């Protein structure tokens, strides 16, 4: 047990409830969902065996229907929504940076450049911050593309507009970091921002790939962040790296040969995470980890459980980016494990 200057006591190893870490509970969780899938699967098999002509069209794949895929604002409200999008993204970034990242505010009147190593165990955050930059720009590009498409832009134009506005917004963030006492301008952050933008553009341009692949963020607030929240101090989830995992997800529901089987409820995840870099008092060492896992496709589950509507579609969209904590890590590789000096 370690106590800081405020008298707050941290448990150095156990940051999650012990029973949640029991692998058998995760096995039971996955088994229940797969079992529940057999009923709709049997119906699909029955349809195939009937006299109804077989179809290989999109609905026959069993992919969830998201109303936001075709949503558009009215002609009356579209100009206002578009103006709010143009202004809201950079202004929101500026306000967030001033409050959480302490941009200048009279403390630093010069621009600093601080490149941070992103490869190797000695990287300040073990590379988790670069994954965070990539995910934030991936999600931002896709959201802004949706906003422009929903306000009247064509598909290709909306992709370009979304990518450019996201780039402007993220670059404002990097310039602001240059005036921060805690960060500084990092060219590697800009590089990983572009990786995220590129991934978002590719998946927006090719819907067939988007139905199979996505980048997701798993997050469960750390004890330090919960402590800050309870004491009304700053709680920046974007830099709470010891509580985050970043994944490239393969959605089995998007594969035609698997979309009418129980496997459509599952995702295959390849993920990366670090522990002990951001909050060293909570861990005995700094570790970098890669894992291969299986998780539930909550987007498909919501579409099957909830009635069609914007509530269901909102949850489906959310789970395309946010990865709930429940997953089954089949294999975990520790890249490095360095005790704190």
Question: Which functions belong to the PLM regions below?
Answer:
Residues 211-215, 264-270, 292:
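Transmembrane beta-strands of outer-membrane beta-barrel proteins
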Residues 172-194:
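Interfacial helix-loop-helix junctions of multi-pass membrane proteins
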Residues 219-223, 272-276, 298-300:
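Transmembrane beta-strands of outer-membrane beta-barrel pores
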Residues 38-130, 134-141, 145-150, 259-261, ...:
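N-terminal targeting leaders of membrane proteins
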Residues 203-254:
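Primarily interfacial, aromatic-capped hydrophobic alpha-helices that serve as membrane anchors
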Residues 240-246, 264, 286-290:
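Residues that define the transmembrane beta-barrel architecture of outer-membrane proteins
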Residues 146-152, 201-206, 250-259, 298-304:
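Outer-membrane beta-barrel proteins
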Residues 198-199, 246-252, 292-298, 337:
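Residues on the lipid-exposed face of transmembrane beta-strands in outer-membrane beta-barrel proteins
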